Amino acid sequence: MDVAHPEEVTRFSPDILMEKFNVSEACFLPPPISIQLILQLTWLDIGVFAALTAMTVLTIAIYLEIVCYLMDKVKCPIKRKTLMWNSAAPTVIAITSCLGLWVPRAIMFVDMAAAMYFGVGFYLMLLIIVQGYGGEEAMLQHLATHTIRISTGPCCCCCPCLPHIHLTRQKYKIFVLGAFQVAFLRPALFLLGVVLWTNGLYDPDDWSSTSIFLWLNLFLGVSTILGLWPVNVLFRHSKVLMADQKLTCKFALFQAILILSSLQNSIIGTLAGAGHIGCAPPYSARTRGQQMNNQLLIIEMFFVGILTRISYRKRDDRPGHRHVGEVQQIVRECDQPAIADQQADHSSISHI
């Protein structure tokens, strides 16, 4: 007797699955609207939703406390704004996840909004490092006599033979472009996805080789890797110098948010698409996977928000930007003791 291979088995239509196998109709329907969801919630579901909403509110309260602290303790307005925008990432993701929890049909759009905001975080993280030196001019002046190792992850860690470089202004512009392209391409590609979705061409359930959804996500993955590389290069060179500014903690939280908001969503979506996450009325398998991801993100961002509060509570009176003349004046002031010592040595030798 011939045995049919898995790829030869004909998929049953939804009507046959509902009639012959008693599969719920909700497994083939779009996500429920909010009022339908609320009417179908059990007391246990209401308790879970209320607890997750309360955690979101606490995450917002933690961020507001961070803002008040930064307004009072960070004197430079440029550095203060950068820290405030970057520390808001866990709060924004928690809010969008909570909205997706209560409005299941908006999950795709709130996920896009969170991803677009975090795309700006690549550029903000680069600015935090640059402003930690005192601005672009101060950083270039400091790194003029240093070499930087560029064979770092995530795209060049397998190339240890790459030479160390001096960070010139032209190379710094390439670093800025690498981080900024994520902030530009993510909103542009997500907007393109929404336009294609209205025409039925953007389907998150379609993982075939001809799927526009698959190719857009692959392009976003490459863009993310290229955007993370310049930030990682500068971080590895600056983490010891900026240890008092808790740069390592800030960068670790940045990477944690990147993994939790991107990789976790992809893993759960793949499991749901492969049938490892079953449907549970009123949710289909895909919607249930998205709800699971939102619930996990709310809990995770609550704890990330607490760690963010610890990492960003640092009094800072140093400027985040200096003009060229100010940098040259600081360099001259730093060189004056060395020049005085050299003159003293010459005078002592002449007396001898």
Curated annotation (Swiss-Prot):
It catalyses: taurocholate(out) = taurocholate(in); prostaglandin E2(out) = prostaglandin E2(in); estrone 3-sulfate(out) = estrone 3-sulfate(in); dehydroepiandrosterone 3-sulfate(out) = dehydroepiandrosterone 3-sulfate(in). Coiled coil: none annotated. The keyword Transport applies. Residues 1-45, 104-108, 195-210, 272-294 are extracellular. Glycans are attached at N22. Keywords: Cell membrane, Endoplasmic reticulum, Glycoprotein, Lipid transport, Membrane, Transmembrane, Transmembrane helix, Transport. Belongs to the OST-alpha family. This is Organic solute transporter subunit alpha. It comes from Leucoraja erinaceus.
